[in-house]
A protein has these predicted regions:
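Active-site region of glycoside hydrolase catalytic domains
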Residues: 1, 6, 50-51, 61-242
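N-terminal structural segment of carbohydrate-active enzymes
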Residues: 1-56, 60, 66-72
Length: 242
């Protein structure tokens, strides 16, 4: 299921060919007066398998030149550390973010990026649309479910792993460069009640909570009571270790 099939087109493999055309594209951004460019690091470009001890220098050099090109045109890079691109090796060998070992691999990635790009990048996002864990778990955290397992349990355990990783990354970013600013990124819109009936207001609030939960944890540093109560009702028990 992980292989490309012959006879099909995969335009996203090339997309706008930013890898080869970034200089002319960034020059156009500058010409249009852009002040910020949000982009994402490809994890496998830095650590091809994800669990290597040493990074790929060619990948690091590419992004370094890209960031310098941004500054050349007066553009501040806003960098997402990982954007739905968990290395395939980490999925097939470790099970993606269901595995706590992912924290160490992600920390290694973050340390490498924060150290190499100190002075070039100060605005970071730890994960793209972290709440997509609940809606598209393979895309979000590289999870393939096993037959008969509690899928909600697996998704929230993976969410716990990523939330811990996000906190670790934030702490590390500030240790390496106090000028770093680290934020989170959510895929969400506001749910509005269909009518003025309390039932509809309650339903809208419940839907909002499923997304805002991820912001609450990262902002307050603890799980909100409404999440704990929901897990209790659903029989979800997270494994939390130091």
């Amino acid at each position: 299921m992980f292989d490309f099939e012959d006879g099909y087109s995969y335009p996203a493999k090339e997309s706008i060919d930013m890898y080869n055309r970034y200089k002319e594209n960034i020059a156009l951004f500058g010409e249009m007066g852009f002040k910020t460019y949000r982009l994402s690091i490809a994890w496998s470009r830095i650590f091809p398998k994800g669990d290597e001890a040493e990074p790929n220098e060619a990948g690091l050099a590419f992004y370094e030149d890209l960031f310098k090109e941004c500054h050349k045109h007066g553009i501040e890079p806003l960098v997402t550390i990982t954007h739905f691109d968990c290395p395939m090796h980490l999925i097939t060998e470790y099970g993606g973010w269901r595995n706590r070992k992912m924290l160490g691999f992600y920390e290694n990635l973050c340390r490498t990026l924060f150290t190499r790009y100190k002075g070039l990048v100060k605005y970071w996002l730890t994960f793209n649309e972290i709440n997509m864990i609940l809606h598209a778990p393979f895309m979000g955290v590289g999870i393939c479910f096993e037959e008969g397992e509690n899928e909600e349990q697996v998704k929230y355990q993976a969410a716990h792993q990523e939330l811990v990783a996000s906190a670790m990354a934030t702490k590390l970013a500030h240790e390496i460069d106090p000028e770093n600013k680290v934020g989170c990124m959510l895929a969400a819109g506001k749910y509005n009640p269909n009518t003025a009936h309390p039932r509809d207001y309650w339903a809208a609030m419940q839907e909002d909570r499923s997304n805002y939960f991820f912001i609450d944890v990262q902002d307050r540093g603890e799980y909100p009571n409404y999440a704990k109560k929901q897990w209790e009702r659903d029989g979800i028990k997270l494994e939390m270790t130091e």
